[in-house]
Amino acid sequence: MRVFIADDDWTELTAGTAPAVRFSAPDLQQAQRMRRGLAGAAILDVTVVVDADFRAAQQQLSSAGVDSTLSYGGTLDGLAGLLVDIYLAGVADGVTLIPAVPQQDARALAEAVSARVAQRLRTAA
């Protein structure tokens, strides 16, 4: 699974080789429909807030006023589960993590969740 972050550039933290196509959708069902029409590796935007406390993350996400992109507010383990589901269900080949709040460090978050995703994918294989 490929992982990118939305920073000044669009930065990949994994080692993908196929050309990537970034896209956004309001939900997983719409994302799966959109993915069918894309050539190359489909990389889905996911706006995120991660906190050790699920309720705190949900409140921050609600306050952030996320637009029409798929969003997640919760724990790091929950985010890893969502990303694995996105990949295994064929919704996307990877994701772009977009912090919903400025205090969220996109790179640190992506590195932490990537390790958990890799572990879950090894277990699923």
Regions found by a protein language model. Give the residues of each.
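C-terminal amphipathic alpha-helical "assembly" element
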Residues: 1-125
